[in-house]
Amino acid sequence: MKIAVVDKALNNTRYDKHFQLYGEEVDVFHMCNEKLSGRLLKKHITIGTPENPFDPNDYDFVILVGAEPFLYFAGKKGIGDYTGKRVEYNGYANWIASISPAQLHFKPEMKPVFDATVENIHDIINGREKIAKAGDYRPITDPDEAEEYIKMVYNMVIGPVAFDSETSALYCRDGYLLGVSISHQEYQGVYIDSDCLTEVAVYYLQKILDSENHTIVFHNLKFDMHFYKYHLGLTFDKAHKERRLHDTMLQHYVLDERRGTHGLKSLAMKYTDMGDYDFELDKFKDDYCKAHKIKKEDFTYDLIPFDIMWPYAAKDTDATIRLHNFFLPKIEKNEKLCSLYYDVLMPGCVFLQRVEDRGVPISIDRLKEAQYQLTHNLNKAREKLYTYPEVKQLEQDQNEAFNPNSVKQLRVLLFDYVGLTPTGKLTDTGADSTDAEALNELATQHPIAKTLLEIRKLTKLISTYVEKILLSIDADGCIRTGFHEHMTTSGRLSSSGKLNLQQLPRDESIIKGCVVAPPGYRVIAWDLTTAEVYYAAVLSGDRNMQQVFINMRNEPDKYPDFHSNIAHMVFKLQCEPRDVKKLFPALRQAAKAITFGILYGSGPAKVAHSVNEALLEQAAKTGEPFVECTVADAKEYIETYFGQFPQLKRWIDKCHDQIKNHGFIYSHFGRKRRLHNIHSEDRGVQGEEIRSGFNAIIQSASSDSLLLGAVDADNEIISLGLEQEMKIVMLVHDSVVAIVREDLIDQYNEILIRNIQKDRGISIPGCPIGIDSDSEAGGSRDYSCGKMKKQHPSIACIDDDEYTRYVKGVLLDAEFEYKKLAAMDKEHPDHSKYKDDKFIAVCKDLDNVKRILGA
């Protein structure tokens, strides 16, 4: 038997040893016949040329090692999904995919995957490859047949039923249902064209959802719920309350929390014998995009012919029901995982679907004004850039316009023409960095760096936020995006889609200020205070640390916040804790850095670095002298900290030992954080695993508590029939944001606070987690919670009658004072400067305010 191995570039790897192909004739080929450290480019590829001849037909099997050979010869991406599997492509039937054994040096957690790959390769070449069992799949294009099938499923014996949908868009308001897939048993599936979904068919679909005899299974439930509810009017409340509603994506997340591993295709490839069942669909998509010259992200499924769509769609639900039957028993064998799935993730999923569906209200008028002002400011910044002669000289020498977004041109300008000294910070490729941090440092050498920072900031605000939001607003004036439970290893929610609501600019209010409550409503934002430290105090059982929080609750005037108390203790400050924030703001920030450094496993050197960053930032803000924190200082601070909180130290050590000895750790709510690289020979990798595992138990305690509090509050609001008057629309980091009718704010606040502070076995007795309002008294007009009025008062006037009246009053008052002064002083009748100065006391945006108000 002749076997070939093809890899990326020349190397000394003994593939016969790695693949255990002893005694077989193995030839090794390299796509590039030279050693290569970077990316493989087209110009590097020599395989198949006279200098590097290769013909797969000379071999019984060809093992493609790594992503590059797999894509080049088998036409596919996703080597991790295909590793150990045989692939037919381009007339050759015996390509075998494999991840590279070189990965094991820096990703030892891949060893089980590679071992399974080797075992599968031996099965294939020795004729022991498992033959996939044939399935019963069919399309339904007749309404009567659709009704008959759905009725049959409803009347069948108890069992799981898997559903899926194919759609013309990613958001239910942007598109429509193309069809619905259903599988009522393994190795079976139908795809029903949406034209066949009559009232009778939809009626029986609802009957299936409500039937106690049926377990309802989806993969990525939240996505399909949007379309089923919006386009078919189906409801899932009964199935959810009876714990019959399931999501195989979340099931897999419970069993393997790593990112990027939860897609249906990947899971079907890994856990079933279905193989690459959507190959024809992917090929059509690729061919269509090439033929019509469109980007893959612009491709929509309504472009796929029905004959190509239905086999793929019908198999999706077969894959889903098989995965459910495989995953759920594993979860239900483990009490902690079972609790996490049923009590946290599934309620969270249903709740987040409601949150997404409500949308976030946007003031289009504010957004357009923001676009106008930002564009104006960007043009001014670009004009300022050209006042520096070095820019004009560079353009003249290179005979092309300078592009501030070109990193290459930026380096040439800053280091060759302006002559700045690089900061020492390098990119991954070893070049001098020009990121925001580097430009901030370079700004101390020359003002051009500050101008470039301003251009970069304004460009991002316009392109990433303003323009994107304007294109994404639904007809009701809201933007709808995604919140996800399965995208982080720690359990923190993430946001993506039309807008990442967790990455809105914090210090710049112009974007948040465009999230505006409708008339008669207010934006209410509540935020957990020092949440991760609080839960560390609870989980550790450190009475001294818990007492700090008890003091803060019982005597808030004397003990205002945790970090002030810690600064008072660590730095032995000669003042009351309540005065620390005012008298020693830099040391308070330093204390904060020490606390989080200790919790997240930083040593003295890293703590010293974090403290110095905090001190420098405060020095820049306040003008206080900067006094460096040395490593010796940091070591002393850590010792003082643990001397005060000894049980915290013992708990941290215990958690670290659990991770080192067992390679996993459970959170309070049952999350299992698996640290696959804990036994790595690289101490840096091992240390990162310990930090990651410990971080997860603290962060998940905070995020899960907040999520469950919001879920319970939302359920209570719905039970009171107030869902339209009190809408939770965002969960961002440690805060819950809602749109609430003005006369119900007090009631909403009571409901939310009570549910978030509910004792879930993770509270200090008599001292629940603190929760503070980010909003102004009585609620805020917009999500900036008052910052918009200070930073952009002209925009704040839009869609805010109350603030507009106030601003107009200031203008009238200034005008009256001007006329009075002019009447008294005939020699100097023009007192417009006084008028402007008086108004600037209210805002710095006089010209735009006058333009908008017509003043």
Curated annotation (Swiss-Prot):
A biological process term (GO) from this entry: viral DNA genome replication
Reaction(s) this enzyme catalyzes, per UniProt: DNA(n) + a 2'-deoxyribonucleoside 5'-triphosphate = DNA(n+1) + diphosphate
Segments for region (Polymerase): 333-833
Alphabetized PANTHER family for the sequence: DNA POLYMERASE I, DNA POLYMERASE NU
EC number: 2.7.7.7, 3.1.11.-
Protein's recorded name: DNA polymerase
Domain of life assignment: Viruses
Domain comment quoted from the record: The C-terminus seems to increase the affinity of the DNA for the polymerase active site, and thus increase processivity and decrease the accessibility of the DNA to the exonuclease active site.
Signal peptide: none
Any GO MF annotation of the entry: 3'-5' exonuclease activity
Induction of its expression: Expressed in the early phase of the viral replicative cycle.
Protein family: Belongs to the DNA polymerase type-A family.
Description of how the protein assembles with itself and partners: Single-chain monomer with multiple functions.
Source species: Escherichia phage T5 (Enterobacteria phage T5)
